[in-house]
Amino acid sequence: MEIVKTIIPHNRSYIEPPIPSATEWLANMSVMHVSCLTIACVFVAITFLSSFFHLFFVLKYVSNERIRNDMYALIFMFPITTFASLVGMFIPRAAIFLYAVSLVYFMFTLFIMVTLLFNIFGGRQEMSAYLLQRNIRVNFTVPPLCFFKFLPTVESTDQNLRRIEWLVFQTPIIRTLLELVSVVVSMEQEGRRESVWFVFSQLMALLSMCIAFYGCYVMVPLGREKHAPYRFDFLFRTCDIAQCIYTIQKFVFEFAAAVGLITSDRYLPAAAKALWWASFMCTWEMMLLSALCSYCLRPAKCKFFDLYPGNDMPALSARDGSNSRVPSFSRRLSIEYEPRIAGVMLEPPSRSSLSITPRDKIEDPTTVSYFADNFDSLSQIQGQ
């Protein structure tokens, strides 16, 4: 709201009435407000029921423990945000703080999405090996920098992937620190938000969020053929849309309050009224997204649920791309990734590493000729 007031000209001499306490608000609500609160309670209850339904299937049908832990955080994204919005509708004075809590959790889920992507491959190092083996490079020409064609591509090394990961991980840390300082400044001003600090903190939070989104947009396209059976793209887009709705919607309502489309009344001042309606919109929007996830990520069509009896999602073999039954994460073979040095296989692709003895590797003429063919390329790489 502070950024909107700074940009939009308004009457600075006008002092908005104070936000009522929860007792005053509940005692003087209109019939429309009571009806909306009742409907919001129903939406939140449905969201919680859906989340417990999701939790049951994750606990029972996801074999990998690290993926289960990531899924827990994503499952509770919708109930936490809707519950915070509902409490803010009951307690208008706490709505701003609860909105900040939900936004911090949204930023935390961005980092969880990156961690989940790593765990699909088995870890960050395994993902790096997979990408290097297929010569898949990191492309930085993604939104919002999709028109900057001059941006270089870099190798998908473990160090580069870690740097992109930190682009995402910085935002929950920065937002948490900014909100803690904002609470201290607000208490010092007896609840008023008239300090220039709030404009600065919101600008910093916006910049941090944009950097985190950019890091996700760079990371998600990597290895898409590998994580496509998991419907990871849909899962990420759902989280992305939820955060955009939660952030942009509040700005739109605050803009309407700043230009006079939403005015103060005997119930709430304009700023609190705008946030109240934004919170109400959030309850049914998150419920719809939760229902959409229930259908599109159903266990029979999503490779995450590898223990589900009806899961028949085909898995691509790492060597020949043939279809097979989805194996459990705990039963993956050690030959899923081909051993390579500087992008060159350590053995001919026609023979399995499990069937070659050390003596075969020395005497096999196929192996000798294979390394002879690739000797020049290895020398060039080392020379660089």
UniProtKB/Swiss-Prot annotation:
Glycans are attached at N11, N28. SMART domains: Solute_trans_a. Disulfide bonds: none annotated. GO terms for cellular component: membrane; periciliary membrane compartment. Residues 60-70, 115-165, 224-240, 295-384 are cytoplasmic. Residues 1-38, 92-93, 187-202, 262-273 are extracellular. It comes from the Eukaryota. InterPro entries: Ostalpha/TMEM184C. Keywords: Cell membrane, Glycoprotein, Membrane, Transmembrane, Transmembrane helix, Transport. Belongs to the OST-alpha family. This is Organic solute transporter alpha-like protein 1. It comes from Caenorhabditis elegans.
